[in-house]
């Protein structure tokens, strides 16, 4: 190859979420909990879901077909396709293999599926970037699909569900460039959330422990990122420049080097706490900074384990980040607020939300931090620079309009019934879905039937 690829990153983004949703305020009444428990306590407004007419195959077929169509992508220009999901329909056959029917005669496409809770999509992104940087690259682009259907058994966790998929076109000369060599990861063995029972779509989850794991992972991945950044800056080999930081009128701290951030969003309230947590790291690095004049003195020498759940730490830094959060993080949680947790698609839906809610002119030249977490556990912190126009991506995504138009509110009773319907349909063969095709939007793939050999057949809504 004559020259190595430059500005590797995201060239196009497509998103899909089901047309049906339940209002979290209605779910509060239905569940008999206090008003605001889900809407304020979790920071959630709506939750997307689907019945037995849709599954991870249909989600992925829909989002990839729309990516190819809406960006006029030649299927022969794709040399890698990788899927990140934890929604498993088959213990052997990959979702990627199902998607091959969209690529015609182009059978020379690398990649399969990546599985680790909500982290699979991020691993697929890293793999695809690594492929383009490697000697194995053949000059073509790659596609990453991240998607899931998040369902929980009845109880406290059920309102933290959601459903959706994101497809990313990755290649050189991209407008949204991943900063080369600059990421930090944290991997541990933990039983915070896991799915050992293959007869059920529902996970085993320890909610409080999982939040603790998420926070520790954020701390460690961010520290690893900062260490790597310092090394690369010293070596002057990474070629990135610091962001220009959205002006907030507040004293500057290292966190201000990110103009915007996107986080994996189990709940939007956790995202707000996580952004505040990053400022806590800045405080520990430089407690004498004028930015931290109002921080209580006892915070300085607090034991690390205690800091993970300490309300003084949480409240102090959430107060300090309130204004910056609205400017820098809120644009990235609009999808999560209105759709819920899309698992693997969550953080990439956050990036899509950000691109769709910030004017392309204001995004140009900016720096985006991104934190991805998957239970069990795997986590990474990385960053992007916007070096080209995101206008076409924003126009195609049209998320502000999509979140309102063509969506149908369903009462909690119907949502409950549809959860039971999915439970009934799980692992069935010789099965005809009962869900109404009328709820499916045009251009969306849906399940027609499953034969007596478990083979699944789909149609596209006209």
Predicted regions located by residue number:
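Conserved beta-ketoacyl condensing-enzyme motif
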Residues: 10, 55-122, 244-247, 252-277, ...
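Acidic, glycine-rich active-site loops and adjacent beta-strand->loop/helix elements
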Residues: 14-16, 83-90, 116-121, 145-151, ...
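Conserved catalytic cysteine-centered active-site region
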Residues: 37-41, 45-58, 86-141, 281-346
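Cysteine-centered functional microenvironments
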Residues: 109-123, 155-158, 202-210, 257-261, ...
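Flexible, glycine-rich active-site loops centered on histidine and acidic residues
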Residues: 133-168
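A conserved active-site cap/scaffold subdomain adjacent to cofactor or substrate pockets
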Residues: 211-243, 251-258, 262-290, 297-298
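C-terminal catalytic subdomain
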Residues: 302-311, 326-408
């Amino acid at each position: 190859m004559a020259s190595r690829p430059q500005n590797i990153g995201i060239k196009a983004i497509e998103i899909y979420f089901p047309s049906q949703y339940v209002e979290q305020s209605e779910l509060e009444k239905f569940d008999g909990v206090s008003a605001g428990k889900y809407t304020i306590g979790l920071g959630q407004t709506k939750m997307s879901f689907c019945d037995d007419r849709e599954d991870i195959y249909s989600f992925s077929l829909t989002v990839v077909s729309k990516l190819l169509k809406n960006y006029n992508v030649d299927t022969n220009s794709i040399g890698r396709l990788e899927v990140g999901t934890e929604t498993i329909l088959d213990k052997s056959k990959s979702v990627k293999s199902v998607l091959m029917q969209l690529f015609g005669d182009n059978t020379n496409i690398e990649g399969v599926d990546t599985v680790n809770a909500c982290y699979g999509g991020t691993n697929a992104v890293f793999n695809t970037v690594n492929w383009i940087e490697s000697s194995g690259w053949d000059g073509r682009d790659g596609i990453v699909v991240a998607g899931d259907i998040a369902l929980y058994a009845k109880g406290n966790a059920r309102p933290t569900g959601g459903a959706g998929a994101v497809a990313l076109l990755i290649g050189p000369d991209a407008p949204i460039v991943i900063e080369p060599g600059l990421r930090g990861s944290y991997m541990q063995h933990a039983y915070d959330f896991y799915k050992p029972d293959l007869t059920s779509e529902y996970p085993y989850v320890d909610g409080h422990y999982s939040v603790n794991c998420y926070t520790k992972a954020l701390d460690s991945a961010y520290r690893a990122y900062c260490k790597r950044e310092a090394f690369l800056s010293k070596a002057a080999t990474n070629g990135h420049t610091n962001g220009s930081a959205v002006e907030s009128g507040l004293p500057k701290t290292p966190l201000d080097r990110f103009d915007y951030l996107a986080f994996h969003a189990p709940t939007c309230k956790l995202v707000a706490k996580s952004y505040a947590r990053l400022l806590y790291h800045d405080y520990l690095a430089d407690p004498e900074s004028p930015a931290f004049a109002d921080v209580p003195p006892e915070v300085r020498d607090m034991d690390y384990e205690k800091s993970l759940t300490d309300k003084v730490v949480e409240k102090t830094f959430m107060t300090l980040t309130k204004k910056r959060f609205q400017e820098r993080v809120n644009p990235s949680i609009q999808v999560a607020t209105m759709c819920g947790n899309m698992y693997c698609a969550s953080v990439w839906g956050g990036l899509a939300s950000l691109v769709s809610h910030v004017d392309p002119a204001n995004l140009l030249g900016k720096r985006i931090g991104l934190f991805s977490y998957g239970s069990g556990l795997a986590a990474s912190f990385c960053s992007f620079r916007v070096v080209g126009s995101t206008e076409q991506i924003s126009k195609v995504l049209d998320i502000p309009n999509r979140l309102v138009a063509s969506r149908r509110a369903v009462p909690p009773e119907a949502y409950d019934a549809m959860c039971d319907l999915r439970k009934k349909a799980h692992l069935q063969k010789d099965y005809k879905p009962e869900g109404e095709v009328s709820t499916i939007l045009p251009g969306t793939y849906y399940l027609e039937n499953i034969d007596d050999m478990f083979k699944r057949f789909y149609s596209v809504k006209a």
